[in-house]
Amino acid sequence: VDFKDKELIIFDFDGTLINSIPDLTLAINKMLSHYKLSSLTVKQVTPFIGNGAKPLVKRALEYSIKDEKISKELLDEAFKIYFSAYKEVTCAETYMYAGVLETLNYLNEKGYKMVICTNKPFGFVEPILDKLSIKHFFKCWVGEDSLSEKKPNAMPLFHLANEMNTTIEKSIMVGDSKNDILAAQNASMESIGVSYGYNYNENISDYNPSIVVDSFSDLQELF
C-alpha cells in the first residue's frame, strides 16, 4: 500500500503532530482550582480530548463534580476561565512527536500540499506552529470554530480539498482520533490512523482507517 498518487495531506494537530496534553492539563487545572476542585493528572485529562475545547471543559467538570448536572452558565464561565488560562500556556510544554520535523521536510520536498484540520480553536493553531517553527510547511488550517461544522463531519475536509484545488480522491486524512477517521469516511476519503495519539484511550484500528502507522516517520514509506 502506498499513497504516492495523493496531492493533499490533511493532518490532525493534537495527538498527531504535537503532544499538547501537558498544557491542556495545566489550563484545565487552572479552571478547576477556580472552583476549588482537585487537579487532574495528564492521564485523567487524555480521554477528554478530541471534540474541541468546550467538550474538554465539560468532561473535566463532569468528572470532577460527579453528581451535579453542569449548567450552561457554569460551563460558559468555566470555558472562559479555561480559554484565558490556555492562552497563557499554549506552548509552554507542547512538543512535536518524534519524527515529525524530518517527515514534514520529506513530504514538503516531495511536493505534497499539507494542511491542518483540527478541533482545537483556530486562534491557538498559529502560535503553536510559530513556536515550533513548522508554520511554513502548511498552506492553511481550519479549527473547530472556522466553519459551521467540525470533525467528524466531512465539511472541513471538503473545504480544505476545495481550497487546495484538489479532489477527495487525491486527498488523505492523517489523525489519531476516531473523529479524524470518521470525518474521512464521511467524505469518502482515505485515511491514515496514528496509534500513538489520544483517541479516548481506544484503539484507532477499531475505526478502520485505510492503514495504521505506529510512528509519524512511517509516513515516509507511504508517500
Indicate residue ranges for each PLM-predicted region.
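Active-site neighborhood of HAD-like aspartate-dependent phosphohydrolases
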Residues: 2-47
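Substrate-recognition element of Asp-dependent hydrolases with the DxDx(T/V) motif
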Residues: 16, 100-129
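Short alpha-helical
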Residues: 23, 52-55, 102, 123-124, ...
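Residue-level detector of anion-binding/catalytic polar loops
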Residues: 38, 113, 190
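Alpha-helical substrate-recognition element adjacent to the catalytic core
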Residues: 34-65, 72
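Generic enzyme active-site microenvironment
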Residues: 10-12, 117, 174
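Asp-based, Mg2+/Mn2+-dependent phosphohydrolase catalytic module
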Residues: 1-6, 122, 127-223
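Metal-dependent phosphoesterase signature
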Residues: 61-102, 110-112
